[in-house]
Curated annotation (Swiss-Prot):
It comes from Elusimicrobium minutum (strain Pei191). ATP binds at G12, L13, S14, G15, A16, G17, K18, T19. Displays ATPase and GTPase activities. Signal peptide: none annotated. This is Nucleotide-binding protein Emin_0125. It holds the Pfam family PapZ_C. InterPro entries: P-loop_NTPase, RapZ-like, RapZ-like_N, RapZ_C. NCBIfam families: PRK05416.1. Disulfide bonds: none annotated.
Amino acid sequence: MINNKKIFIITGLSGAGKTKALQIFGDFGFYCVDNLPLALFEHFVDHLKNRKEENIALGVDIREGKDLKTLPKIIANIKKADFHVYTIFLDASDSKLVQRFSETKHKHPIQKKLIAAIAQERKQLEPLRNIADKEIDTTNLTLGELKEKLSKVLVCNLKKDSEMQISVLSFGFKHGIPLEADLVVDVRFLPNPYYQPKLKEKTGLDSPVAKYIMSFPEANEFLIKYLNMLKFLIPKYMKEGKSYLTIAIGCTGGKHRSVFIANALTKALSQSGFTVSEYHRDIKK
């Protein structure tokens, strides 16, 4: 039986971004565990054989102390069990590490003066750096840039559903703006099908309503312009590390105009290669 499970071991200097990296892996859909004692690694991996998770990220740091020297052998044993193992080592300049510790007020795991602690940690982690498959210098990286770098490392391993999840939501302003919305657009400038006797009881998912709305040039013009704006914005949000985006489309009651526009945008974004879900909050109210 072929084992498709992949284990990414994240390690590196304290303050270089291990915790943030694990959060990013979690956003990518990985099953993440931080600070699992190395003595339990092989038992944990054996346990994973019967779990559904295929992508796992494990955090390792200097707090493992003398046990760190066993990691190369542990990795070799895990590979023998047919797991795909990839080690990422995070580093940053001494000055940046000092700055980060100063900003966060965290104490270094090695109880010494900070500069001395960083120097000792570098020396102790050198064997791990030497076996790492990828080393990332986070000195000048924003969170979004770190995520972008990790994305490139994982590009061959990530599932489609670990990409940015886009939700297009229709709603009625009289029922309140959705709290989860990242972007809100008001389409009440479009003629309202509600005032057409034959359309009043229908919704924006019905063909007669769609035809009515699209009979007005401003509807098509809006769709084209807003879609182009979203195609511009979405990659920018992804670059900054955003994993979820909720686009809320509102009209008066949330039954006609917003539903049609939300449905049309969902189809267009999907055709453009984005992962999109659609939800009509107030369509039955």
